[in-house]
Amino acid sequence: MTHAIKSERECQRGFRKNLCVNWDLIHLAETTSTNDICRDLPAWTAVRADSQTRGRGRFGRAFASQKGGLWLSASLPATGPAEVWAGFSLRVGASLLTHLKSIGLTAARLRWPNDILCGSRKLAGLIIEQPASGQLIVGFGMNVLNEPWTDSPELSDTATRLADWISPVPDLETLTTGILEALAEAHTQMLAGGMPAAIEELNAHWTEPLPVEISLSSGRTVRGSFLGLAPNGHLQLLDQTGSVFLVEHPTVERLRELEG
């Protein structure tokens, strides 16, 4: 177990923007799922694996996790009322996007709720689980040097990797440090401002109407132009008549971008 993040003394010198959290980092060569390992770990502990055999995304979807990518999960405290953490995945997505842009990935953008894309191809994604009261598990996966389409040819038209967008590519240790710092910042911001501040930041990324198709948990499918989030976190869509309607975010199983 190692400390992946700078010490508190370094924090005081300004390296951590006053977010003085010392993460304990466990590094594994291979595991089934870093999220599963994190379930039994205390807050501010993270697990990184070189590869996963049963990585997963939202709704239990399989997530390719080859060696050369960044596969990371972190255990965070969920203190206070449950409503404080409603929409935390959106807050995390905004913080991670800001961080990736800061290291030179200017092409990065966010697809609701928290997929990170470059162009039309998926670079990274995250999943947030709450296995126990008072605990949040954030799982983050990003293609870095790996080529996911070699194991999953169906990803050849939909996936990308960091090495195709920036050079030189930061090493996995440096990337891990930056991601954990972004998670700590998202946690602090959520406690301070909840969802309203996150929604404002997210809507600043979603400035142009985007044609989408949304699959709902009821089995229905709706189409419209995605306009961002309403103050309550629901999705705002513009229909063909020019009317704006809301889609409740808990009912959304998948959002697919359409050709404009």
Predicted segments, located by residue:
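N-terminal lobe of the biotin/lipoate ligase/transferase fold
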Residues: M1-L105, E208, E257-L258
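Residue-level signal for inorganic ion chemistry
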Residues: T34, L72, L96, D115, ...
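A generic structural motif
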Residues: D50-Q52, S75, L117, E129, ...
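Gly/Ser/Thr-rich beta-alpha loop segments that engage phosphate groups in nucleotides
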Residues: T53-A62, I127, G141-L145, A230
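Acidic (Asp/Glu) carboxylate-rich active-site/surface patches
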Residues: T98-S133, F140-G141
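Short, acidic (Asp/Glu-rich) active-site segment that either coordinates a divalent metal cofactor
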Residues: G134-D164
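Conserved, helical-rich catalytic subdomain that frames metal- and/or nucleotide-binding sites
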Residues: D164-G219, E257-G260
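Conserved RNA-binding domains used in RNP assembly and mRNA/RNA metabolism
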Residues: E208-G260
